[in-house]
């Protein structure tokens, strides 16, 4: 019974650890620094814009449109910090639907484990109560002859004769202990009776001798 309970406890702790690992979106200690796209329900987080006042210039900036587009593409393609880019690639993406399914299944499985443990404990207690009843009935129906007396009568067939084979060793030990205790009680009773008879004889002899001396 203790082994079964320890196994259930280890399994329950393992499931809870897996559940927490899956529920955390960034289990490796990495945090997002940029925009994560392609996820359901995820919104693009725009970085704060630093608004700086440019000085007024009294001449117009003249740039060609082709050069301006190429420059904007190069700045968009090359990340400002390569370590941030690698971290964004290594992030474990969060899946809320999968996490909910795993959470519900783990909770249901843990409830089923608890119910199974309770049922097994109830069955174990009922089996122990039945064994105690069988032992009590066996103790009541057990007949042990006194030392030196002959066995009389036939053995009665009752509930004590129909026992489970699993409990034979325990019943044998119990029967041996009962036999030893009853024999010791019988021996003590006989010794007390002998001592009482000896003391009675001594008192009778003493009284008889006193009467003879008086005569």
Swiss-Prot record:
Spans annotated as Disordered: 191-215
Gene that produces this protein: C19orf18
Record topological domains on the Extracellular side: 30-100
Entry keywords, A to Z: Membrane, Signal, Transmembrane, Transmembrane helix
PANTHER family on file: RIKEN CDNA 2900092C05, RIKEN CDNA 2900092C05 GENE
Entry's localization field: Membrane
Major subcellular location class: membrane
InterPro entries: C19orf18
Pfam family, one: DUF5534
Compositionally biased intervals (Polar residues): 196-208
Taxonomic path: Eukaryota, Metazoa, Chordata, Craniata, Vertebrata
Cleavable signal peptide: 1-29
Name this polypeptide is given: Uncharacterized protein C19orf18
Membrane topology: Single-pass type I membrane protein
Record topological domains on the Cytoplasmic side: 122-215
Transmembrane segments: 101-121
A single Gene Ontology CC term: extracellular exosome
């Amino acid at each position: 019974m203790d082994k079964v309970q320890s196994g259930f406890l280890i399994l329950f702790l393992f499931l809870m650890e897996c559940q927490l690992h899956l529920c955390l979106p960034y289990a490796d200690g990495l945090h997002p620094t940029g925009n994560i796209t392609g996820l359901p329900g995820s919104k693009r987080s725009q970085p704060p814009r630093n608004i700086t006042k440019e000085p007024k210039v009294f001449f117009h900036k003249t740039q060609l449109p082709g050069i301006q587009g190429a420059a904007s593409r190069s700045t968009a393609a090359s990340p400002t910090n390569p370590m941030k880019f690698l971290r964004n690639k290594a992030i474990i993406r969060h899946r809320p639907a999968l996490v909910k399914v795993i959470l519900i299944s783990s909770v249901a499985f843990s409830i089923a484990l608890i119910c199974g443990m309770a049922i097994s404990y109830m069955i174990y207690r009922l089996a122990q109560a039945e064994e105690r009843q069988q032992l009590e009935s066996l103790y009541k129906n057990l007949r042990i002859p006194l030392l030196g007396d002959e066995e009389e009568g036939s053995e009665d067939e009752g509930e004590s004769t129909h026992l489970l084979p699993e409990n034979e060793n325990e019943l044998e030990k119990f029967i041996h202990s009962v036999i030893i205790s009853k024999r010791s009680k019988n021996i003590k009773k006989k010794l007390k009776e002998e001592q009482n008879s000896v003391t009675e004889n001594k008192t009778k002899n003493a009284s008889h001798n006193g009467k003879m001396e008086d005569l």
